[in-house]
Amino acid sequence: MKYQKINKLVLFRFISIWDQRFKFESLVNVFSILITTICTFSVIIILSVNDGFKKNIVNILTDLNGDKRIYPDEYLSLSEFDYQQITSIYKDQFKISRFHTKKCIVKTSQNSEAMLWMSTNKDDYFFENIKKYLVDGILTDSTVVAGDLFLEKYDLKLGDYLSFFVFKDNFVESAYKFQVSGSFKTNIPDYDSHLILSTYNLFDDEIEFEYFQINDFENTVSLDKINKKYLINDASEINSSFYQWLNSYDNPIKLLVFFIVVIALLNIINNNYYLLYYKKKQINILLSLGMNNASLKTIIVIRSSLYSIIGCLAAILLAYLFIYLQSNYYLIPLPGYVYFTEYLPVQVNFYYILFIFPFALTTAFLSSILNYNLVSYE
């Protein structure tokens, strides 16, 4: 009974964050918890922003380029018959859009620009989905929409007309003139400055398609039924340069997180060592009074674990509060054409918590035991 009271008294004294009699030691405790909080908060925010940034880029690329594309295998183009055949096989298992593209020269009143002209059917998924990128005007089946950067570069306004010259074998194959009825903005400069969108209802001649685009594709769907007749490209092949860039961008982020984790580790280890080293006399007195090593180690482990939990909990609350506010109210704006988004992207991911607590508690436990053994032999 006597030893239980001593254990409780020692536990209370050791886990106290602030003690008026030992202000410097108390400041060290507060500073240690603060460092744990800052490090954990930084890791959560960095990973959340990184995931949000990648998700934003992938979503834009998927909206514009699809999850997969179907190309002709034996012939130069796809037909309406191919479209009907594929949709009859897979029905509503994914969204499919028909694309007719033209590489052309677009002439304005000031200058000319090489552009990619993409046209689709007004009833296809792409036609409806692209509307979320429209910043002004509308997309109709008798007009075209252009990227925000292109319109800004040549000081064009909605209602202006553009002349299109389509070349084949260095000769003008066809020429068109259509009104600009809207502008879109994806925050990807190449698209917003060199892409024209329309429906293929603009063309009088019979349309053939370069490819079909698949969106909302589930990996459980098998394309074996059409694999032999058509070439099928995955998103990673369509957007290979972007995906390679995203992967290379990922490495510095991982390195930064690693260094922050190392700082957090050193902080926990250093705090435990400081406690044991400067309380060495008190520990020896407690041992001489009859307290056993196991009880003292348990108290040190509880203290270290408690400090780690307090720091991690504070960081988690602050981090997810910030993520919630940023995802709903867009507190931090960004230059769109630099970061491909107009606000700091964040991704809510609670799996970070599953890693943080076990890692912090394991570190606290091991550093407490190792430091205790180290100091006891000094």
Residue ranges and their predicted role:
Residues 348-378:
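C-terminal membrane-exit region of the final transmembrane helix in multipass inner-membrane proteins
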Residues 22-30, 222-278, 285-286, 299:
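Peri-transmembrane interface segments
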Residues 6, 59-109, 114-121, 326:
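Membrane-proximal extracellular/periplasmic loop immediately following the first transmembrane helix
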Residues 26-28, 38-65, 273:
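Alpha-helical transmembrane segments
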Residues 118, 154-233:
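Basic-flanked hydrophobic alpha-helices used for secretion and membrane insertion
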Residues 282-327:
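Transmembrane alpha-helical interface segments in multi-pass membrane proteins
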Residues 1-40:
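N-terminal Sec/SRP start-transfer signal
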Residues 115-153:
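Short beta-strand boundary microenvironments
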